[in-house]
Amino acid sequence: MSLKNIKPDQLKNLFQQNIPLMDVRAPVEFSQGSIPGAVNLPVMNDDERAQVGTVYKNQGNEAAVKLGHELVSGLVKEQRVAAWKSFVQAHPEAVFYCFRGGQRSRISQAWLKEAGVERPLLVGGFKAARNYLIKQIEEFSVRQELISVSGPTGSGKTHFLRGLKGCPVIDLEALARHRGSAFGNWEVPQPTQVDYENNLAREILLLEDKIHGKIKPLVEDESRLIGRISQPATFFIRLRSSPVIWIDEPLPVRVDNVFDDYILNSSIGKSLEAAPRCAEENDILRAQALQLFARYRQSLLAIQRKLGGLRAQEVMADLEKAELAYLNHAELSGNKVWIEKLLQYYYDPMYLGSLERRHVTVLFKGTRFEAEKFVHSLT
C-alpha cells in the first residue's frame, strides 16, 4: 500500500485484505462504535480528552491544542508512540484514523514519522467512514434483491445459513450477537447499534463479489429488533418484502435443535462435560450455568402476559424442575419438556400469525436438507 492517505470509498479494499486500523480516539469514543477491524490506541485517554474539551469550549482551539501537547508529553508521549510503533511492526499495512481525520490523527501520524515509521490516515476519519458505511446499507437495500429464510423457531434457520458454503449469506444473528427471540441473549454482550450497522455494511461490501447467477443473498427472517439492536429501516423493508425459503421440520426435531443451542452447547451443557478441569474452572462454569437458568426465568416472566398466566406457570414449573435436575443429578434432558411447551404455546402461534399477516411469497418449503438442495440448484 502506498503512503497516500486513504479515502472512505477504499474501505472495501481494507476489509478484503483484513488490514487493521488504528483508532486514536479516546476509549469512550471507541466504545460507542468503531470501524470494523479497528484497534483502540488513543492519543489521549478519556480524562485528558475531557480536559482538552473543556478548555476548547472556554478558551478556544489554540489553548486546547497547547493543553493537549502538555498532557501528552514526555514519558506519556513515548509510551503512546511506542504502542503505535509496536502495532505497525505487527501490522505493517495499518491505517490511522480519529473522529474527523483532523488534529489527532495528523499529530499521531507526525509523531510516528518522527519515530521512523510512516503510515497513512483515513481522510475524514470515523465520521466520514460512518457516513460511507451507512450509504452502502441504503444503496444495497434499494438495488439488491434478497431471499428471506423463514420457518418456525427451532427449524434450524441459522445453522442452515451457516452451512451454505460458497453462497452469499448475511448472518444477522452473528452480527447482533443475539438469536432474535425473547430467550435469544448470547452469553456475551450485544454490540452497540453503531458497531452493528458498521459490521453489516462491511458484510455487504464483502458479499458483492459472491453474488452471481440466480442466487440472491440469503438472510434470516428477523424482526425489526434483534435483542436491543434495531435493523436499518431500508434494509428491514427489503428483507420483509423478499420471497421466502420456508424451512419446515417436525416438532421433535425443532425441540432437539433448541435444546442443543440453548442447553447442550451453552454454559449449562459445558459445565457437565467430562473434560478434566481445575476446581476453580468448574465453579466458574457452574455459576455461569446458574446465571443462564436465571436469565431463562426472567425471559419467561417477560412474556408471561402474552403466554397466558396458567401456561406461564406451567412452563416455569417445568423450567425450575429441569434446573433442579441439573443441580441434583447432572441431568439435562428434562429441559426438553419446557422447550416443547414454549414452542407450542408461544413461538408457533406468534410466528405463523406474523407470516399470515405479511402474505409472503414462498419460493420453497421443505426440511433443511431439502432447502439446501434447492439453494444449490440456483447457483
Curated annotation (Swiss-Prot):
What is the disulfide pattern of this chain? none
- Pfam families reported for this sequence: Rhodanese
The secretion signal range is none
Which chemical reaction does it catalyze? 5-methylaminomethyl-2-thiouridine(34) in tRNA + selenophosphate + (2E)-geranyl diphosphate + H2O + H(+) = 5-methylaminomethyl-2-selenouridine(34) in tRNA + (2E)-thiogeraniol + phosphate + diphosphate; 5-methylaminomethyl-2-thiouridine(34) in tRNA + (2E)-geranyl diphosphate = 5-methylaminomethyl-S-(2E)-geranyl-thiouridine(34) in tRNA + diphosphate; 5-methylaminomethyl-S-(2E)-geranyl-thiouridine(34) in tRNA + selenophosphate + H(+) = 5-methylaminomethyl-2-(Se-phospho)selenouridine(34) in tRNA + (2E)-thiogeraniol; 5-methylaminomethyl-2-(Se-phospho)selenouridine(34) in tRNA + H2O = 5-methylaminomethyl-2-selenouridine(34) in tRNA + phosphate
Q: Which top EC class is named for this enzyme in its record?
A: transferase
Active site feature: 98 (s-selanylcysteine intermediate)
Assembly, in brief, is: Monomer.
Q: What is this protein's name?
A: tRNA 2-selenouridine synthase
Tell me the organism: Bdellovibrio bacteriovorus (strain ATCC 15356 / DSM 50701 / NCIMB 9529 / HD100)
Query: What taxonomic ancestry is recorded?
Result: Bacteria, Pseudomonadati, Bdellovibrionota, Bdellovibrionia, Bdellovibrionales
Gene name of the record: selU
